[in-house]
Design a protein with these regions (language model features):
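A surface/extracellular/periplasmic glyco- and lipid-processing/surface-interacting theme
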Residues: 24, 37-49, 55-57
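Short aromatic-acidic-glycine turn motif
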Residues: 33-45, 120-127
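Intrinsically disordered, low-complexity Pro/Gly/Ser/Thr-rich segments with frequent PxxP/GP/PP motifs
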Residues: 48-107
Length: 173
């Protein structure tokens, strides 16, 4: 089980590597295959994902818009324009780029990342998931009485064998 306790967010480190003889252009990134339900009342915890190389920070809001990756501004807000509408990245064969994607939600959502790429005249989408399963991001609601719906904490949950549950230290305020 993976968790971020940074308040409505999850960070995923994504390493993309060029594998073709000609350059590959990264043209877009967004959350895809999105399925959301209200947040559960629970808590789970796990270490973050790792990657190497220079890191480009992006954010995806699963609760608003078209779920395109956007730049995080210095004040912590999101640029209203999709990041790749003005920041294409060209990968040569063997070259890598690392994106740290901050995922925001107040619900529980299953999703994958869809990276739009072009190599020569060929375009396509590379789907990124959690070892074959969709990512599961969730905000946790600790009080469903109707009087107080906060505080929220955000968790990312993965069903793969590297996860674990910590019953004493889950997403608590």
């Amino acid at each position: 089980m993976r968790v971020s306790e940074s308040g409505f967010s999850l960070r995923i480190r994504l390493v993309l590597r060029g594998t073709r003889g000609e350059p590959t252009l990264i043209e877009g990134m967004k959350a895809d295959s999105l399925e959301c339900v209200p947040a559960p009342t629970a808590g789970i915890m796990k270490h973050g994902l790792e990657g190497g190389g220079e890191i480009q920070s992006l954010a995806v809001d699963l609760d608003h818009g078209k779920h395109d990756a956007k730049a995080v501004l210095k004040d912590g807000s999101l640029d209203p324009r999709p990041y790749f509408s003005k920041n294409f990245y060209e990968l040569d064969e063997g070259e890598s780029v690392v994106y740290e994607v901050l995922v925001l939600t107040r619900r529980q959502c299953r999703w994958r990342l869809a990276v739009q790429v072009r190599s020569g005249e060929t375009t396509g989408t590379v789907h990124v998931d959690d070892v074959g399963a969709p990512f599961l991001a969730s905000s946790v609601v600790w009080d469903r009485s109707g009087q107080n719906l906060g505080p929220y904490r955000t968790c990312l949950v993965s069903d793969n064998e590297t996860g674990y549950i910590d019953r004493g230290a889950g997403c608590r305020q």
